[in-house]
């Protein structure tokens, strides 16, 4: 079973493309969705997060306050590193377990890992490069990313720009891409690209 690593900057349309690939039969493991799972009420990361940051990092329902954590992580590099040390190993463990289950079932034509920080983690012990056959980058202009995130999440422009600045550059993602979907235009231009890659991934 071919294994695809799908990535792109915030607001690039990763989730939308992953959903369309899933509709076409792909097994999809979304690391961002898993990140939400482990920081939900009773999630696997909650005890360690409280130990590291205190109970004030939780909402009233017991979930991690994502807005507060995001603001802290992007203003304090030490806090960001501490957060990643807690969450990244858990996310990776669960992702690989679900991916292995999909591969063992052989019920899908190919497997897609959705990894927002795939390019940032290409080097080192926890690189995704050795785990995927092809890297698929969802690409769009940076200004388009920023506008989409502001419209979707209602975040201040300065915070969105800070998030974008701390991610891999557009050029860095394109440099390692095996396949690229251009999501800078209309929806009508996006779907044929998804169909083309779906057929290509099935053929191997």
Swiss-Prot record:
Domain of life assignment: Bacteria
UniProt-listed Enzyme Commission number(s): 2.7.1.24
Molecular function GO terms recorded: ATP binding; dephospho-CoA kinase activity
Keyword Transferase: yes
Primary location recorded for the protein, binned into one broad class: cytoplasm
SUPFAM superfamilies the UniProt entry points to: P-loop containing nucleoside triphosphate hydrolases
Residues reported in the UniProt entry to bind ATP: 11-16
Reaction equation(s) it catalyzes: 3'-dephospho-CoA + ATP = ADP + CoA + H(+)
Domain DPCK: 3-204
InterPro entries linked: Depp_CoAkinase (IPR001977), P-loop_NTPase (IPR027417)
The protein's enzyme class: transferase
A GO cellular component entry from the record: cytoplasm
Keyword Ubl conjugation annotated: no
Subcellular location(s) of the protein: Cytoplasm
PROSITE patterns to which the protein is assigned, alphabetical: DPCK (PS51219)
Keywords, ordered alphabetically: ATP-binding, Coenzyme A biosynthesis, Cytoplasm, Kinase, Nucleotide-binding, Transferase
GO biological process, one term: coenzyme A biosynthetic process
Pathway: Cofactor biosynthesis; coenzyme A biosynthesis; CoA from (R)-pantothenate: step 5/5
Biological role: Catalyzes the phosphorylation of the 3'-hydroxyl group of dephosphocoenzyme A to form coenzyme A.
Protein family per UniProt: Belongs to the CoaE family.
Name listed for the protein in its UniProt record: Dephospho-CoA kinase
Source taxonomy: Bacteria, Pseudomonadati, Pseudomonadota, Betaproteobacteria, Burkholderiales
